Amino acid sequence: MVAHARATPGHNGRVLHVILFQPEIPPNTGNAIRLCANAGASLHLIRPLGFELDHARLRRAGLDYHEFVDVMVHDGLDACLDALQRPRVFAFTSHATHRYTDTRFAEGDALLFGRETTGLPDIVLQSIPETRRLRLPMQPDNRSLNLSNAVAIAVYEAWRQLGFPGGT
């Protein structure tokens, strides 16, 4: 299921890259595997992970989609971005002021999501230009969306903007 970091923009027809920073909940990552398989995106996981990659709930959520997606595990965010040849990175956070729908995505972009419990660390957010820190609108008294739901919303918007390449 897991490959060594070797992806480049457009690698194996992958026009988008999803990066999960230190994910903690196996079903969310499993759902992201299935989503990336269906949208033709690659999935990058940044260590430490909150679970083992052979976790039963991860396999159940990803079903048999592992063969249709490039899943790569990296020791850190910099290693991941180096492997991807430093793509444009969009960080999704409830603290951003820019909406994801006001952004023009391009082939090879990387969509970065934080931990389920704490989001992205400030040091990571500060390394991303403010115009590339994006939020998904929600009701004012809510803290956040489920990670796999946020990934799905963002990936499908980016894929839509690109014209759903490879989709039917």
Predicted segments with their positions:
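Post-transcriptional modification and biogenesis factors for structured RNAs
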Residues: 1-168
